[in-house]
């Protein structure tokens, strides 16, 4: 019996589709792209099925939307399949209420050789008043995959505006911090094991 995904789709078929997309992506030009080429905006009405025991929208629902939007932006930039490598920062600033419309905006901030950092901003809109509140922000890192599921090179990024250049500079700082933190933890563990 073959495996099925959550929606009943045979996983073997999905895996072959991913491999085919990766093969096609490998043939893509690696010419740099601007952030606008991969920007994503998702919107979703928040109903009772998404509520936590406090009556607000469960944070996990927001996190799933963030990962989805960021993954689409990264995949657009890479021109093929990507996987979430890390959630670098996640901030919940204000609750989202049942009845709100959630707007999730994702754009590529910077790229490495095989990695893509995507910034995400979440806003909740009160339908009756139209008032929007910035509720969450996150930075995620994705890795582009080839047909064997191995990391593959991604196109460069060409910021076009001062805001995009600012985001890219901040992304480089976050990357430096991630690498320094990983190295400090590795050294600490080596000391404990010695």
Language model features: what each stretch is:
Residues 43, 76-77, 82, 91:
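N-terminal leader/targeting segments and the first structural element of proteins
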Residues 47, 51-65:
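A conserved, well-ordered hydrophobic junction motif at loop->secondary-structure transitions
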């Amino acid at each position: 019996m073959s495996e099925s995904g959550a929606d009943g789709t045979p996983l073997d078929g999905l895996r072959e589709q991913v491999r085919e997309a990766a093969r096609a992506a490998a043939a893509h030009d690696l010419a740099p792209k601007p952030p606008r080429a991969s920007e994503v905006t998702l919107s979703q009405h928040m109903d009772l099925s998404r509520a936590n025991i406090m009556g607000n929208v469960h944070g996990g629902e927001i996190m799933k939307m963030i990962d989805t939007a960021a993954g689409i932006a990264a995949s657009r930039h890479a021109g093929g399949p990507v996987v979430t490598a890390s959630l670098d920062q996640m901030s919940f600033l204000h609750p989202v209420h049942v009845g709100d419309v959630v707007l999730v905006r994702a754009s590529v901030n910077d790229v490495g050789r095989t990695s893509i950092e995507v910034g995400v901003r979440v806003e909740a809109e009160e339908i009756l008043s139209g008032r929007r509140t910035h509720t969450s922000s996150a930075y995620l890192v994705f890795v582009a995959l080839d047909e064997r599921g191995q990391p593959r090179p991604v196109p460069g990024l060409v910021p076009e505006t001062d805001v995009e250049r600012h985001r890219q500079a901040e992304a480089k700082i976050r990357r430096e911090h991630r690498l320094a933190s990983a190295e400090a933890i590795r050294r600490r563990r080596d000391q404990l094991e010695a």
